[in-house]
A protein has these predicted regions:
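Short beta-strand to alpha-helix junction loop
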Residues: 79-101, 152, 216-224
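Redox-cofactor binding/interface segments in oxidoreductases and associated redox assembly factors
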Residues: 9, 148-152, 264-266
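N-terminal Rossmann-like FAD-binding beta1-loop-alpha1 element of flavoenzymes
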Residues: 2-32
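Long, low-complexity C-terminal extensions of enzymes
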Residues: 284, 288-391
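N-terminal FAD cofactor-binding segment of flavoenzymes
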Residues: 21-27, 32-74
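Predominantly flavin-linked oxidoreductase catalytic cores and closely associated redox partners
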Residues: 106-240, 257
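Flavin (FAD/FMN) cofactor-binding and adjacent substrate-gating region
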Residues: 53-83, 101-102, 119-131, 193
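FAD/FMN-dependent oxidoreductases across multiple families
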Residues: 190-191, 216-290
Length: 391
């Protein structure tokens, strides 16, 4: 049985990105990726803000320099426009095709599709030094051994402050419309249990991605989100020829990440931005740094990296989510205030993890203080997370 140097569980965004960065080093290490899907399809969408052209912007099929916010209660609309930053749309299939093609140029890296990991055991490696161990992974197809394991599968169960549930439709419109501006958060409205809005990407003059999104204390079912998305399309009188495909997902916001006996990537490593759910560029940054860490060390890593200390942005995100959870009826007010007072470039820097300390202070003062002060002075011992299973 072959023993691999590195085994990556999951060939999604994080797993493929790590393998891609490893192959860029021309490594001679034997690496295998185990992916449960039979084949890659255009199953999701990644969006991000960027000011410089790079590989990811070149793979994107659409970008905008304008995005807007809208609240239903008073029909207030705030529009951002940037001369520096652009908002990019990257279909998953473009990413999968590029990454798998690049990975296959290195004969030391293999990708195994339709492979589900059922059991992982850790044991001493008899042919190695006494301090080294080997992992053995049982799958539906074969048994694999590896000196290092990186698990990039999403954590299926965990405590989270909030859950972002969404259902989206790629729609072919009956009539053409402007495709210059993204409806980033439109039709915002709240009740005492959740905050909801519509997210609309005009991919062409006759093709849009329409997503209905809700922030709630528990994940919402696909059937419910589909029903609400359909209702929104009717309410807004969006006339369409046909629905090309659909997307459904649940993003944990403020996930309490469980400790692991081996390395983790993607959502398990904290790639999801707590307050927004944006993850794509964070995953690329992690993959670049972690691939170099794996290669440069003369001996194999024996323990997963220590949990990172909370920085100011993490603290801000946590307070933000606790405030939305405590009083969801304030959500629209908070987001409209943020959109109105934080101009396009500041907003883009903050959303893309490139904000300075001054930027963070400006973000703080752009929002109404009272809801956050109420959260700060509320009972700190009161449980704030929910234990839920999500797919």
């Amino acid at each position: 049985m072959r023993t691999y140097d590195i085994l990556i569980i999951g060939g999604g965004c994080a797993g493929l990105s790590l393998a891609y960065h490893l192959q860029k080093t021309n490594t001679h290490q034997k690496i295998v990726i185990l992916e449960s899907r039979e084949q890659y399809t255009n199953d999701k969408t990644w969006c991000f803000w960027e000011k410089n052209e790079n590989l990811w912007t070149s793979l994107a099929t659409k970008h905008w320099d304008q995005w807007s916010f809208h609240r239903d209660s008073d029909h207030q609309t705030i529009q951002h426009q940037s001369q520096i930053w652009k908002y990019y749309y990257l279909p998953a299939i473009k990413y999968y095709e590029y990454m798998t093609k690049a990975i296959r140029t290195n004969s030391n890296i293999s990708l195994k599709m339709n492979t589900q990991v059922s059991k992982i055991t850790k044991e001493k490696a008899p042919l190695l030094t006494p301090s080294e161990t080997v992992y053995q992974l049982e799958t539906n197809n074969d048994t694999y051994r590896a000196l290092e394991v990186v698990d990039t599968r999403p954590q299926k169960k965990g405590e989270s402050l909030l859950f972002q549930s969404f259902y989206g439709c790629h729609i072919e419109l009956q009539a053409s419309q402007s495709d210059d501006c993204v409806a980033l958060m439109h039709n915002m409205r709240t009740d005492h249990t959740s905050f909801r809005f519509n997210y609309i990407l005009p991919l062409s003059k006759t093709h849009i991605l329409f997503e209905h999104t809700r922030f709630a204390s528990e994940p919402l079912s696909e059937d419910l989100m589909k029903k609400e998305c359909t209702s929104e399309l009717k309410r807004l009188r969006i006339k369409h020829q046909k629905i090309l495909r659909t997307e459904y997902g649940i993003l944990p916001m403020g996930l309490n990440i469980k400790p692991s006996q081996f390395h983790t990537g993607g959502q398990r490593q904290g790639a999801l931005r707590d307050a927004s759910g944006y993850a794509f560029l964070r995953i690329q940054k992690w993959a670049d740094a972690f691939s170099k860490e794996l290669i440069k060390r003369s001996s194999h890593l024996t323990k997963p990296p220590k949990k990172r200390k909370k920085d100011l942005q993490k603290i801000m995100d946590t307070l933000f989510l606790k405030t939305l959870k405590r009083a969801p009826q304030n959500s629209s007010k908070i987001f409209i205030s943020l959109a109105k007072n934080a101009k396009a470039d500041l907003f883009s820097r903050f959303m893309s993890d490139q904000s300075s300390l001054i930027d963070k202070i400006r973000i703080i003062i752009s929002m109404p203080p009272w809801p956050f002060l109420q959260t700060l002075f509320s009972n700190p011992l009161q449980p704030t997370t929910s234990q839920k299973t999500y797919d």
